[in-house]
Every structure is written in structure tokens, then in C-alpha cells.
Amino acid sequence: MAAPCGSELPANSPLKIPKMEVLSPASPGDLSDGNPSLSDPSTPRGASPLGPGSAAGSGAAASGGLGLGLGGRGAASSSVSFSPGGGSGGAAAAAAAACRGMSWTPAETNALIAVWGNERLVEARYQQLEGAGTVFGSKAPGPAMYERVSRALAELGYERTPSQCRERIKTLRRCYSRVKEHGVGKRKSSYTFEQLEQVFGQGGWDAQPCQPVLINSSGLYQELESDGSTMEDYSQEDWGNHSQELHGYPTDQELDEMPVSKRTLKIKQESSEEAQKRDTMQNIVQILESVQLKWELFQSWTDFSRLHLSNKLAIFGIGYNTRWKEDIRYHYAEISSQVPLGKRLREYFNSEKPEGRIIMTRVQKMNWKNVYYKFLEITISEARCLELHMEIDWIPIAHSKPTGGNVVQYLLPGGIPKSPGLYAIGYEECIERPLSPDVERHALDPGKEGRVDLETLSAQASLQVEVEPTRIIYCYLGIAEVRTLQQCLFLHFQANAKTFSKEWVGINGFLSQNCIVDPGVSPKSIYIKFVEVERDFLSAGSLVECLEKAIGYPLKFNN
């Protein structure tokens, strides 16, 4: 959890004078939170809220209606400054302020919301039922809960007593309920409805838990104008505008000021990431379909308890059908290579998790009829093999200039691990295809012989074939179990005249033959990739078949 930026303010920061707020020394510790105004943060633990001049301050307030200003956060004792109050109701205002307690700043309120959400998740784990996921009980949080919240706030630099935290939570819950039921408020707030929805949603303590939105280190909410207002005093129209402002959505003016190149780059990055995720999921679906697994209907957690999935790695898919179409379609697919399958499936079939909430909502709204799952158990070495294919980039192998006539030497890159693992060798394939119809039509049309333009002539002369984007073809999967990755790759790429042959015999023969080139002709571009795997795991699983299923074609030099 990031510490709020307000905790870094110097002790001599400018003083702010709250409006009509006077604190009485009679109640410095247990202060309620009925005051909705937003002003300076509280004093450090162990120091009097009034500082050295508390007695004078209370006497002056009782006689002349004086206001009190507190010093900057983090000081050992708060400095006190007095300013003339206005009117004859000073004593009444002082008494009312003492009852209400010290007000909460925007940063404090947001930190409290975040801490409260975290503590509710901890409480949920204490109440977890065997084999049933996270379930909240109906018992309201007790004093211990507010003690933990108070300590957590202290770690962030905000000194609040448990009773103050309890009163503030009550106020926030009332604010949330009012906006939830009526959809309207009166004035602005430093927190959004979405934040409160995440920690108070659907009935308060019985709500579904969700990680709260934390304030960022730049003080997103700290810079809001402290106008003494809360969410209760907030109109529906202003609420939407304020929520958009808090979440940082760009306005039309900001979009106009943003350079077009930056906007285009951001869109391209997002679209590239989405395309990569889509391609990865399609690859996983292809693997699941290639092994012809049967869909299983999800009914209860009893099914999973029989399967003993707590310590298994697997490739799994989540599917669904509808009342109109019985065919089962994929909703999601994943390789659970780091987290046990049982834990991942719980997240997708537990309505209190973000993934599970999506599925539950679609079933409740009758978008889906039934939910299904399928999985293929894999070994650790097979999981690393799939990681090698889907997450590790190819490394090109350079070659020297021809020596001794028409022979080139491979130049392996540095940094190849001296440890066991898996490695793959591939080569770049160029696919040629006939000329496009337009070029063929211009070339074969006799009626246009006298008026062929320069573009057509250039196409006929230099583009006899159109080359598609190249792709790298896997041809060999190696297991560095007895030797290290570095030793295995060096053995493959050592150019030896004795191994030269016109017929390719294994991967070494292929690499040796590729070193012999005709004058003016470059050898095939060769690539490698590798991943470290513990030696004890390398002997488990069917690694070659695993990779062949993932890439969709056989490895040429492994058979």
C-alpha cells in the first residue's frame, strides 16, 4: 500500500484555519466523526490535539468564540494559532465541534476506505468455510477490527483512534446507502461511489469483497479543494462529473492538447496487448482441442474435492452454453503453470472473486445457461516447455563471412546459461506466392501494351513474387539434462567439415549443410530460444509431443 503523499509534508507547512471548528481539551482522545467537513489531518498519537496552548485556547473559545488551526502533519506537537471568531455563538460552536470530533482530510478518508477493504478481506479468510470459498458471516465487525484499522492507518502516517475509525465508517456507510437508494446527493466528495461500492456494496458487511482503489503517491485526492463537504451533499449530475475527474478520464480539452502521436501510440500499445492476449488464448484453445477433452458441467465444489486439484498444474478452459444454443463455447483458457489448478478454478467459480463474479452475473441474467470446465494435467517440465514456446523470444544466430571458399561459421550469442533446461532451434521460412491479379492483368492484357505505366513495369521487373511476412519454423527441441544448455548448443553449432553432407542427417547435419553457401547467397537464418529447468523435472512428461501439439506441426529433426 503506497504511503499518502501528505505524510511527506514538512512540519512548517502553512497553517489552515477550519471554519467554526473549536476543539475542547475535555475530549481529546475519543472523538466521534459526525463532522463531515474536510480540513487538516489529526495530531500525532500521544500528543494533545490542542498542543501546548490548549488551556488558553479553550478559555478563549469559551469567552470570545475563537477558531483553532492545527500545524502540519508529522510534527512532534501541533503548533497552535488563533484567529478571531465571528459572532456571539462561539461557545455553542465550540461545544458542537468538540462533540463532532476532529474532521477527516481527503487523504485520510481514502486511506481509511482502502484499509477497511483490506481488513475485510483478512476477516473473510478467518471465516472461510472448508471447500466453499470465501464466505462472509452475518456478524458485524467488533472492536478488534477497528483496532487493526487504527494501527494500519498509523503505519500510513494517520493517527486515528478505533472509535474515530468506527464513527467514520458508520458515516461512510450511511453516505453509500443514501446514494445507493436514492441516486442523489448534495455536494462534492474526495472519494467516489465506486470506492464505497467495493467495500460496502450489497448490504454492507455481507457484501462481496473487492480490493479497494488506493490513492496514488502523487496525492490525487489531496489536491481537491477542502470545502467542508461530503458525498451526502452531492448532486447526481455533479457526482458523475466528479467521479470522472477522480478516475483521471481525459476531458475534451486534454485530448485536444495531447499530441496526436502520443494518442496514436497509446492506442497501438493497447491494441497490441489485446491482440497478444487473444493470440495466446487461441493457442491454448488449440492445445485443448487437439487432445479432445470432454467438457464437465460445474455443479458444486464436491466435484473438485474428488479430483484432488490442490497441487496440480494444468491447461484449463472455462466454457458455457445458452438456452438457444447447446454448443459449448470458450469463455476463457489458461495454462496454470505457476498456481495450482484448484486455486485458479476456485477464482473462476467463486462469486466473490472478480472472475467468478462475471460468470455468476451472466448466469443470473440468463446470458448463459450452464458453465463447464475442462483441463489437461501437465508436468512442471511440460509447463516450462509451453512457456518456452509462448513467452520466450527467438534469438537470431549470426554467422561470419565465408572462409575457405564457401563455408560460414555460426556465432553464438553470449549469456547462454551453464545450467540444465530446454532449448529449441528454428529457421526462417519465406513463403512465395504468385503475382497479384492486378499485376498479372496488366502484364497479360495486350490492349494496354502501349500505355503500361512505370509502376507496372517496376512491378514486373522487380516483384516477380510477393513475399509474405516471414515466420520461424521449429525444427528441433533439445533437452539439456546431462550437459548444460551452453554445452548442448555449442555442440550443435560447431562447424565440422566431417559432418558436411548433401543429405540432412539430424539437426547437426542440417546446421552443417546450412554453412555451405554458393557465392552471393546467404545461408538460412537460424534462431534459438531456451529456458532453464531444474534437472530433476526434465525427465517427466512428453516434451516433444507437448510442443508439437502447441505449434500444430511435427518437429522435423526429433523423429
From Swiss-Prot:
Keyword line: Isopeptide bond, Phosphoprotein, Ubl conjugation
Keyword Metal-binding present in the record's keywords: the answer is: no
Locate the cross-link: Glycyl lysine isopeptide (Lys-Gly) (interchain with G-Cter in SUMO2). Answer: K268, K343
| Region: Disordered, residue numbers | 1-62
Where are the Phosphoserine residues found in this chain? S13, S24, S27, S32, S48, S436
Annotated coiled-coil segments of the chain: none
List, as start-end ranges, the regions of compositional bias called Low complexity: 46-61
Q: Where is the Myb-like domain?
A: 103-173
Give the protein name, as stated in the record. Answer: Myb/SANT-like DNA-binding domain-containing protein 2
Q: Species name for this entry?
A: Mus musculus (Mouse)
